[in-house]
């Protein structure tokens, strides 16, 4: 029989075909070396006797370790090939919102919190998150969004965030946001249900809200925008630090994203990013994710001689809003004109406030630029999509 017992890096000293750290070959065996791709050499022992066995512990250890390492190398090689193929391959292209899952590619939700999360040590909070996430996972498109019976603690957190931010909006938020904000009549003692908000958006811009259990895969989330659907979480951030959340929660979604989606020109801007994502390569999805980050999340717009915020990451963060206008500890962020065709900088979200904001002349101008970029990467096979039973040509 033939048995693979070792692998050698070519930098290792070889004496008479053996690694200097290996035991000599068993009597009756002949040594064969087979070169593998890359910098590895596979060593095989071919036994002429069926009774020959690995008698020494060191030999068996070499066999097990080497076999495991070889499997790891082969797995890495396969993964690298798959990643290279993904960069150019075209994934299945959704033709309607029904083709997009809101639960198969969740990057984090429920009780799966990292150690640096404020609620990591709060078992009851994690259970609560998990129960709310389950409501989103059972939701069917076309059915009313399940209501969440928010607790007094969750309402307290919501009210604190709302009362803190509302004082900054008149001077820091763009006029489109302020106009749309009035449509929702937010109150500090009541957390609005997603179904109520979705109905307002449907009447104003034709957009819908779909509940989601947690952070969606970027492709799924961006694909949803192409069907004028915004995926929103329903859970509330941990009460120990009401002005901070490491991931999207209902305060961020409702105060940051929802109002501005009632503005037709902004809705077109978000829609353009979504259209570009249909059938996009992994490389293009990564670029679109950055475009989304620097517009929908942290975008700014000229308003006369001032710069105002329209991104949800700004509008749901008291500290970020102030930083945008006056800087922090003597550091002033820079403002760069939005150009979707240029390489976007690394996204920053765990090392303090943004160092750079992208600036739009107007929502209409930004939407036009994003549509031009969308047309440049849109796959030929992406001809139209469906809103309900109505096909829309792209």
Swiss-Prot record:
Its cofactor is Fe(2+). One of its GO terms (cellular component) is chloroplast. It is found in: Plastid, Chloroplast. Keywords: Allosteric enzyme, Chloroplast, Iron, Metal-binding, Monooxygenase, Oxidoreductase, Phenylalanine catabolism, Plastid, Transit peptide. Residues 1-79 form a transit peptide. Fe cation binds at residues 252, 257, 297. Its main location: plastid. Disruption phenotype: Mutant plants accumulate phenylalanine and caffeic acid esters. Residues 75-97 are annotated as: Disordered. It catalyses: (6R)-L-erythro-5,6,7,8-tetrahydrobiopterin + L-phenylalanine + O2 = (4aS,6R)-4a-hydroxy-L-erythro-5,6,7,8-tetrahydrobiopterin + L-tyrosine. One of its GO terms (molecular function) is phenylalanine 4-monooxygenase activity. It comes from the Eukaryota. SUPFAM superfamilies: Aromatic aminoacid monoxygenases, catalytic and oligomerization domains. It is an enzyme of class 1 (oxidoreductase). InterPro entries: ArAA_hydroxylase (IPR001273), ArAA_hydroxylase_Fe/CU_BS (IPR018301), ArAA_hydroxylase_sf (IPR036951), Aro-AA_hydroxylase_C_sf (IPR036329), Aromatic-AA_hydroxylase_C (IPR019774). GO terms for biological process: L-phenylalanine catabolic process. Its EC number is 1.14.16.1. Catalyzes the hydroxylation of L-phenylalanine to L-tyrosine. Does not seem to be tetrahydropterin-dependent and shows preference for 10-formyltetrahydrofolate as cosubstrate and electron donor. Belongs to the biopterin-dependent aromatic amino acid hydroxylase family. Forms monomers. This is Phenylalanine 4-monooxygenase, chloroplastic.
């Amino acid at each position: 029989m033939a048995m693979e017992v070792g692998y050698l890096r070519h930098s290792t000293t070889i004496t008479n075909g053996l690694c200097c750290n290996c035991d000599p070959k068993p009597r009756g065996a002949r040594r064969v070396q087979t070169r593998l791709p890359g910098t590895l050499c596979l060593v095989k022992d071919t036994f002429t006797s069926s009774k020959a066995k690995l008698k020494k512990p060191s030999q068996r250890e070499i066999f097990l370790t080497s076999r495991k390492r070889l499997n790891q190398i082969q797995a890495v090689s396969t993964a690298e090939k798959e990643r290279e193929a993904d960069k150019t391959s075209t994934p299945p292209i959704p033709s309607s919102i029904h083709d997009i899952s809101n639960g198969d590619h969740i990057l984090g939700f429920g009780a799966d919190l990292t150690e640096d999360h404020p609620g990591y040590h709060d078992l009851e909070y994690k259970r609560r998150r998990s129960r709310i996430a389950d409501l989103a996972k059972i939701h069917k498109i076309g059915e009313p969004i399940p209501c969440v019976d928010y607790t007094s603690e969750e309402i307290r957190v919501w009210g604190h965030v709302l009362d803190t931010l509302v004082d900054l909006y008149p001077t820091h938020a763009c006029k489109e946001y302020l106009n749309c904000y009035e449509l929702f009549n937010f109150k500090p003692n009541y957390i609005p249900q997603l179904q109520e908000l979705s109905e307002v958006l449907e009447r104003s811009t034709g957009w819908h809200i779909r509940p989601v259990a947690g952070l969606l895969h970027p492709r799924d989330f961006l694909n949803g925008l192409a069907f004028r659907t915004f995926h929103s979480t329903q859970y509330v951030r941990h009460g120990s630090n009401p002005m901070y959340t490491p991931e999207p929660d209902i305060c961020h979604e409702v105060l940051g994203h929802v109002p501005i989606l009632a503005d037709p020109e902004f809705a077109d801007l978000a829609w353009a990013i979504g259209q570009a994502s249909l059938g996009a390569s992994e490389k293009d999805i990564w670029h679109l994710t950055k475009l989304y980050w620097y517009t929908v999340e942290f975008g700014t717009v000229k308003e006369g001689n001032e710069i105002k915020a329209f991104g949800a990451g700004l509008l749901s963060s008291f500290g970020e809003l102030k930083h945008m206008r006056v800087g922090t500890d003597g550091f002033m962020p820079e403002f760069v004109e939005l150009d979707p065709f240029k390489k976007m900088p690394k996204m920053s979200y765990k090392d303090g406030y943004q160092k750079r904001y992208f600036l739009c002349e107007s929502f209409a101008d930004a939407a036009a630029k994003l549509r031009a970029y969308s047309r440049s990467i849109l796959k030929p096979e992406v001809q139209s999509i469906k809103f309900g039973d109505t096909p829309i040509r792209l």
